[in-house]
Every structure is written in C-alpha cells, then in structure tokens.
Amino acid sequence: MAAGWLNSAHRIARGGNEMAETAVLVTGAAGFIGYHVARELLEAGNVVVGLDSLNDYYDPALKQARLDLLTPYPGFSFVHADLSDRPAIADLFAKHRFPVVIHLAAQAGVRHSLSHPHDYADSNLEGFLNVLEGCRHNGCSHLIYASSSSVYGANTKLPFSVDDPTDHPISLYAATKKANELMAHCYSHLYRLPTTGLRFFTIYGPWYRPDMALYLFARAITEGRPIKLFNHGKMRRDFTFVDDVTRVVTKLMTLVPTAEPGQNGGAPARVYNVGNHSPEELMHVVALLERELGRPAIKEMLPMQPGDVPETFADVEALFRDVGFRPSTPIEDGVRAFVRWFRDYHRV
C-alpha cells in the first residue's frame, strides 16, 4: 500500500453517522488515484462499490493488480462497467442510492487526446453526464469529481488560482475537464446537487500510471533507453504525492458545499486546486530518479509537445482555508516511495 511505502498512513475518522452503513461509489477504482482512495476508505471500515471499465488505454494487468489488493476487503464490491453504458450506470445508482460519489474515472492523457478524440467524448462527457443523472435521480448528497490543472490552458499567471480564467484550453482532454466543471455547476444550480471539483496537479506515487512521465522515465532508465525530455527539459511541474491527494479527498467528503449568496451563482458547487504548491524542475526530478535507481539517464532533448505547457503551479489557499490541509510531501520522499514500489512491482 502507498501508506506503507511512505510510512505515513492517514486514517479517516468515523463519527456518529458511520459511513459503513451505506456504500460510497468510487469510479475508476482500478485506476491510480481511484485505487488509493478506495483503499483508504476501506481501511477506515467503509463500504465501497468500485466501478471500472478495465480498458486497455494502458496495461490492464496493472489495473487488475490494484483491484486484487482491494478485493479481500469485506466491504468492497466491484462492478465492471463502462461509464458510457447508460442503462448499466442508471441501474447501479438505482440499486445503491449512494450518498457520496467519488468520480475519478475518465479517459486521461493530453497526448492520447490528439489521436483518439472520441474516447474523451464517450468517457469524459457522456460518461460524466450519466454519473450526474445517477446522482440527480437517486438522492446523492455529495458528488466529488476529478477535474485537472490542464483547464488553465495557456494561462501565464502563476500560481494558478481557482479564480483565474479557464476559457482557453489547449487540448481536448482539458476541454472535457472544463466541460465537466460546467456540467457539474449546472446540476448544482438546477437540482441543488452539491458538487466538488478537484483540479489535480501531476499526481504521482506507488501504483502509478505507466503512461506518465516518471513511470516512463523509470522504465527507460532501467532498460538503458533514452528518456524524452520535451521543451529541451525546461519544464516545471507541481508534483503532488498520491497520499496527500487521498487525504484531501477523504477530508472533503464531509465538507458538503452549500449555496451561498454571491458565490457560484448561488449553486452548492466548489472547485479546488489539489497540488503541492511547489513546482519542481523536471531535470531535478530526473536526477532524483537517477539517484534512486542507481543508473544514469540517457537524455533525448525534444521541442515542446502540442497541447502541453511549460509550467504548472497550484495556489491551494482555498483548499487550506476550507479543510485545514495542503499537500506537502517533499519530492525526494515521494520519488523514493515511487521507485521502491517500481522496483518491487517490476522486480528490478
């Protein structure tokens, strides 16, 4: 488990109204963030229904390995379904009437959206609409959903604030995430569905996605292949450790947005940045990987990739104000935890 790798487990306090009596839905439960959130809830004794399509965007064996770690928990059940399957999603919501839904499933990846745009419409738009409809018709009291720092698009003002304009996405993936925020706000306004959107900033850690930079770099370094450094390595990212993200999500579960005059058009909707508020030079992170893996990287310098940005930097003051916590795991500790898991999983 991630908490074991970092030796910093966080437990969810269970108050008088124990959530074990009703199930929490976690979509994308076999995915990177979804697995960690589901496991944290189960560790605290909650009942969790995990949903995932187990598609082949990346190796399904890794998704199954995560799922295999959740299956032994007595409070866990798994539903194999696609978000775009409207009847299946409607039946699931009608059966369980989830009080809290944590929606982390999506078609991810900026670069993949350049070549497979319809995947994003199916999962991120139609699939999200099915989740919203399920919440609307079945008494959901709080929908927490994943947005992305990519919604800031071509913004040059740093750090990125939740009050900044997000009207100029530079990838289809970012456009679908912005659309999710607008759709959620609409349902909050029309149907008084409380929604909380989380703009994630470069989440990493054990059980990482193999299409992400740190994982790709680690594989290439261990196999003696070049690593591709876009913008000639002149990139800065607000790397955020997954255990910090899990803690944010679980803290926000009981912080249900309310309608406040003069805010968000009176809708019970909130959006937060979830980042480490401390951008790291990409070359520094590569050096940390080299140190932890004990091997030098062969570096291939390339121009900027379409749809990418040179820097991300999260302003998390709104998050800290409302939940009293901000991600803060040092990059050195996080990379060490990731590499420890990577070595163990790949036996290298």
Could you tell me what each predicted segment is?
Residues 88, 119, 126, 165, ...:
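Residue-level recognition of oxygen-bearing side chains
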Residues 179, 183, 187, 217, ...:
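Hydrophobic alpha-helix immediately C-terminal to the catalytic Tyr-X-X-X-Lys motif of short-chain
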